[in-house]
Amino acid sequence: ASESAAAVPLADPPAPFLKVRIAGRFDHAREGLLGLEVRGPVLGAHLVTPLLRDGAPPVLVNRGWVPLEGNRPVARPDGPVVVEGWVHPGDRPGTFSATDDAAARRFYTFDPPAIGRALGLPQVAPYGLVVLGPSGGLPDPARTLPRPTNNHLGYVITWYGLALALVGVLAAFAFRRGRPR
């Protein structure tokens, strides 16, 4: 239902994963790349651009996927823009997270305060926005709201497989105990 719902104006603080609309101007001079993602044979990353707002801290916007190599043109709108997407509450680096390279503006964990400092914006919003939209150029935005993983079939196969194996072990044990010596 929320997928087809209209985006609402950004409230401060916003609810995580809420579909919102926000206005401002992109600061393309302070872009960075987030993560690594392979699409087909092409390695790419997500383009993160600060959105400057009047009277409010900048918001880091994940505008979508871009290839790391090649010279395909990436859209960089000038002037005022209105962006729709979902609120990304930010992540904290884990024990096995890759180390960010602030000098190269390469980030592997979406931590808005840390990314903001690395991009020269010490006062960014503690959340970000992931742009939603149709494919049709670069950057290639997300098309759906995030969904939790659904591993139910895998769990069913695992647990029924273990139960079947246990029945087999018990049958072998009972057969051996029941044989005369």
Where are these regions (language model features)?
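Surface-exposed, charge/polar-rich loops and edge strands
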Residues: 1-181
